[in-house]
Design a protein with these regions (language model features):
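Catalytic-core helical/loop segments in enzymes performing group transfer/polymerization on anionic/lipid-linked
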Residues: 1-209
Length: 209
């Protein structure tokens, strides 16, 4: 995962990200779809993107807050837009077209409700704060603002990755219909993401002509 830069949506341009030069701590806030089941059932207190941004600003008043909205919200297909007041007060900058893997090496923290990006960030060595109760919280790997009481024992990151990606799921090659290993899937997704990025770049160049 670290080597190939594969993420959940496997979309967004993979290119260098230039962090802000204001000297402040860089906090990445990852948006989700408001009303999503994972928020309704897994985030008992903070339940919208706007509430998340206000909470993060209150918790990190001096930080540079970088907000990445959910791709479906950016496309206008799902709920989760942020008011102008919240954007002005809570957000220092936004990123819309870059993949998360371009951002992870540069951020000091990632804050989210229940997004899978928190798990990805842990794998990439980023400090993660959860405002909900996703599966990767409560094991001593994240800072949890609203922890799940039933999770009491620490778990090494390697164990969490193994249980999440190897022991629990089964993978099928969507091209052949045959079983495949997690490593095979990662390589295939990486190749697909690279191909999609090249196609997008060609389309963007054509539009500029």
């Amino acid at each position: 995962l670290r080597q190939h830069g594969v993420s959940k949506y496997n979309v967004g341009t993979i290119k260098p990200f230039t962090p802000p030069a204001d000297g402040r701590s860089l906090v990445l806030v990852v948006g989700q779809v408001d009303g999503d089941a994972s928020i309704l059932t897994g985030s008992p207190v903070i339940r919208s993107n706007e509430a998340l941004l206000w909470a993060v600003r209150d918790a990190r008043p001096e930080a540079h807050i970088l907000f990445k909205p959910h791709p479906d919200v950016v496309a206008g297909n799902r709920a989760g837009a942020i008011s102008a007041e919240c954007l002005a007060h809570c957000v220092d900058s936004q990123v819309l077209d870059l993949g998360l893997t371009s951002l992870y090496p540069h951020v000091d923290e990632l804050h989210t409700m229940t997004s899978l990006s928190g798990f990805e960030a842990l794998v990439q060595g980023v400090n993660v704060t959860t405002w909900g109760q996703p599966f990767y919280s409560g094991w001593g790997l994240t800072e949890d603002r609203h922890p799940a009481p039933r999770r009491q024992r620490p778990l090494p990151l390697a164990a969490l990755v193994y249980l999440t990606l190897v022991a629990y799921p089964r993978y099928i090659d969507w091209q052949s219909g045959l079983w495949m290993s997690p490593e095979q899937l990662i390589r295939q997704l990486a190749a697909q993401g690279h191909s999609s990025s090249q196609k997008a770049s060609r389309w963007q160049r054509w539009q500029l002509k």
